[in-house]
Amino acid sequence: MADFTKFLTTAPVAFILFSSFVFALFIEINRFFPDILTF
Amino acid sequence: MRTFLSLLLALCIALGLAQSVQAEPLIGLKPCSEVPAFQALMNERLSSLEEKILNASPAMAPVYQQKLAQTSKRFERYSKLLCGEEGLPHLVTDGRLNHAGEFLIPGLLFLYIAGWLGWAGRSYLIAVRDEDSPEMKESLIDVPLALRCFLTALAWPAAAFKEIASGEIREPEAAVPISPR
């Protein structure tokens, strides 16, 4: 388990996890607030 | 003292510059709801969707129905913006406050988020710099430390101002390596 968490924190894996979260967040924002042009 | 005087000069110039004319007709834009081309575009889009709904199979009708709702909502929202003669909304980006939501606020938000990420990375690098193997901490991320850096970096404008004011952000001239010449 310790090895697995260590694997998860290697920079490429951590980057993929983090960016998946961010991109999913953007997709969801665009689903619930489509066509945002202004605040 | 020299920095202070130049800042003062910059401030005087900024305040002395003539305010840009606020009247909107002068930039050649009208509210979209008054521009015929915008109305035509809206009617064209909406009627083509309505036509699709009439001809659609029962399975596809709700999809077009939803699309119609979204499209009419979009045109309703954009009709409050300013349009050019061609009927497309223009965003006013010169910083006038009654159009702050179009560029000023998103722009500042962008700078804030970019600065947040940069400051978080910087503080992480500074935090691991004095440990045994800083390179290792760059390839094997210390997640609790990184999360802490992200959280504290939320206040980066204040932190940056403090570091600039105290001169902490600058390296002494002697500490900057130069290539042999």
UniProtKB/Swiss-Prot annotation, chain A:
Which organism was this protein described from? Synechococcus sp. (strain JA-2-3B'a(2-13))
Q: Which domain of life is it from?
A: Bacteria
Name of the molecule in the record:
Photosystem I reaction center subunit IX
List, alphabetically, the HAMAP family matched: PSI_PsaJ
Q: What kind of membrane protein is this, topologically?
A: Single-pass membrane protein
The UniProt function text for this chain reads: May help in the organization of the PsaE and PsaF subunits.
| Gene Ontology, cellular component aspect | photosystem I; plasma membrane-derived thylakoid membrane
Keywords from the named record:
Membrane, Photosynthesis, Photosystem I, Thylakoid, Transmembrane, Transmembrane helix
Q: Per the UniProt entry, what are the Gene Ontology biological process annotations, in alphabetical order?
A: photosynthesis
Q: Which Gene3D superfamilies match?
A: Single helix bin
SS bond list: none
Q: Transmembrane residues, as ranges? A: 7-27
The gene name reads psaJ
